[in-house]
Amino acid sequence: MSANPLRVLAIANQKGGVGKTTTAINLGTALAACGERVLLIDADPQGNCSTGLGIGRTQRRTTLYDVLMGEAPVVDAAVKTELPGLDVIPADADLSGVEIELGQTARRSYRLRDALEAIRANGPYTYVLIDCPPSLNVLTVNAMTAADAVFVPLQCEFFALEGLTQLMRTIERVRGSLNPRLEIQGVVLTMYDRRNSLSEQVAKDVRAHFGDKVYDAVIPRNVRVSEAPSFGKPVLLYDLKCAGSQAYLKLAREVISRERDRQAKAA
């Protein structure tokens, strides 16, 4: 059973190196493997999400830049990936010019939200995942303004919670002025090393702070997860049996289950 209506999630953390793009790629893949119809939006000018899904530069004729500039609808910008049910709107370096080009344009913060309206009611997708850049700029603001909720990957490292403070302030600002419905979807612990007592302590602190917003599924440090992007593949298509793949499948099932519960309560 697929989630319906569409759920738009901004995958964000304003601290770099937390596994944000890795989570976007592999959660999107795992959701599609579970039967969902997923659109990944690469909102980072570096284009790592696109590269990690095997979308070469020649396949990026239409990108998120074109969508935000009003030159292409979402459905025309979406590129099919190797996995049925998973499409991506790619990014390239042009995206870094959006902030200047939009300038003081009316509704500059609503560009992505307006573009997604066309697929909210009867589009082909059940989930949209937006891979946000780590910096707070017009791309991050557009992602959060378009999103129903923010999905937070959190690395099991010493300064993990410190990075969250800035993200929470950003969410509050967006909620106050642009998107009052924005909420925290959940927090997923990444790069977890059970041999390291620090990982255990960070996990304990995060669960104490966020309670049931923290997913039970934990993404371990896993060499196969690290290797997969260099082959242009999500880890599930690179090595399905590895611990990283199984963790992302567990996370996807948990996301779907929680979404069904949320919809049931809202009905």
Swiss-Prot record:
Annotated binding of ATP, by residue: Q14, K15, G16, G17, V18, G19, K20, T21
Q: One GO biological process from the UniProt record?
A: chromosome segregation
* Gene3D superfamilies (alphabetical): P-loop containing nucleotide triphosphate hydrolases
InterPro entries in the record: AAA_dom, DNA_Partitioning_ATPase, P-loop_NTPase
MF terms from GO for this chain are: ATP binding
Against Pfam families, the record matches this protein to: AAA_31
Keywords, comma-separated and alphabetical: ATP-binding, Chromosome partition, Nucleotide-binding
Which CDD domains does this chain map to? ParAB_family
Q: Does the keyword Cell division apply?
A: no
Concerning PANTHER family, the annotation shows: P-LOOP CONTAINING NUCLEOSIDE TRIPHOSPHATE HYDROLASE, PARA FAMILY PROTEIN CT_582
Query: What is the role of this chain?
Result: Involved in chromosome partition. Localize to both poles of the predivisional cell following completion of DNA replication.
**Family under the similarity heading:** Belongs to the ParA family.
**What is the name attached to this protein's record?**
Chromosome partitioning protein ParA
